[in-house]
Amino acid sequence: MGKELYEQHALAKRLFDEANEILGFRITDIMFSGTDEDLKQTKVTQPAIFLHSVVHALCMGDEFQPDMVAGHSLGEFSALVANKVLSFQDGLRLVKTRAFAMQKACELRPSTMAAILNLEDAVV
């Protein structure tokens, strides 16, 4: 996840390396060669998704000229950074705080999520 960007773009490498410092752990190790179990931890998943989305947008440079941006939940942070309303660093710090808080909540009250596809409303 994101390894190709890291290897092919100097800006991506700089941002990924900066993310390792901001997060306090080597997210690149997990994103590029970690286990699914490591990546499924919300304290890793959320920064990884944010990082991949934002790095991709920022590496597009001047090619990325959106008329508008939108995001839902975690995607709101990516949208704000991609549209230069929020800095990469501040966006990642916010996502880190959010992710660690949600990780703690998950540990205090374990739960799970399921997707239900192709069933009639009455069946669900």
Where are these regions (language model features)?
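Helix-rich "cap/lid" substructures immediately adjacent to catalytic or cofactor-binding pockets
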Residues: M1-A70, L119
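Glycine-rich nucleophile elbow surrounding the catalytic serine of serine-hydrolase chemistry
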Residues: H72-V81, V85-L86
